[in-house]
Amino acid sequence: MRNPAKQEDLIKAFKALLKEEKFSSQGEIVLALQEEGFENINQSKVSRMLTKFGAVRTRNAKMEMVYCLPAELGVPTTSSPLKNLVLDVDYNDSVVVINTSPGAAQLIARLLDSLGKAEGILGSIAGDDTIFTTPARGFTVEQLHEAILRLFEQEL
């Protein structure tokens, strides 16, 4: 039978290692975990953990391909409330900028556009994880920002 405390420690160590963004192979992760006292860890277990936690290979600051677990790369599921896909809402003098989980921006932008001018939205432009929304005539950027925050129940 598995020791839940040991499993929890393994998960914490695994996530901490990936935050360092310096491991380019599963073998390197295995060795690092073994050095931290997890003697029974192997490549297949690391592979399953990488998949389970949504790890991706990306370039770090040194332009090396490494495994990482960025929080903003949370994978949306069919049961995710839309508000969980919105990571940040900010604005300047012209537009409201909404940062979302990767792949969610067009879905959120479509929702915003469906609310229309009566709700203060002139239009939205969406990429993969960023939306630019501009207020309709008669609405300020601040009013639009507050309306979007209310819509997604974010704090000011």
Swiss-Prot record:
InterPro entries: Arg_repress (IPR001669), Arg_repress_C (IPR020899), Arg_repress_C_sf (IPR036251), Arg_repress_DNA-bd (IPR020900), WH-like_DNA-bd_sf (IPR036388), WH_DNA-bd_sf (IPR036390). GO terms for molecular function: arginine binding; DNA binding; DNA-binding transcription factor activity. The keyword Chaperone does not apply. GO terms for cellular component: cytoplasm. GO terms for biological process: L-arginine biosynthetic process; protein complex oligomerization; regulation of arginine biosynthetic process. It comes from the Bacteria. Its main location: cytoplasm. Keywords: Amino-acid biosynthesis, Arginine biosynthesis, Cytoplasm, DNA-binding, Repressor, Transcription, Transcription regulation. It is found in: Cytoplasm. Regulates arginine biosynthesis genes. Belongs to the ArgR family. This is Arginine repressor. It comes from Yersinia enterocolitica serotype O:8 / biotype 1B (strain NCTC 13174 / 8081).
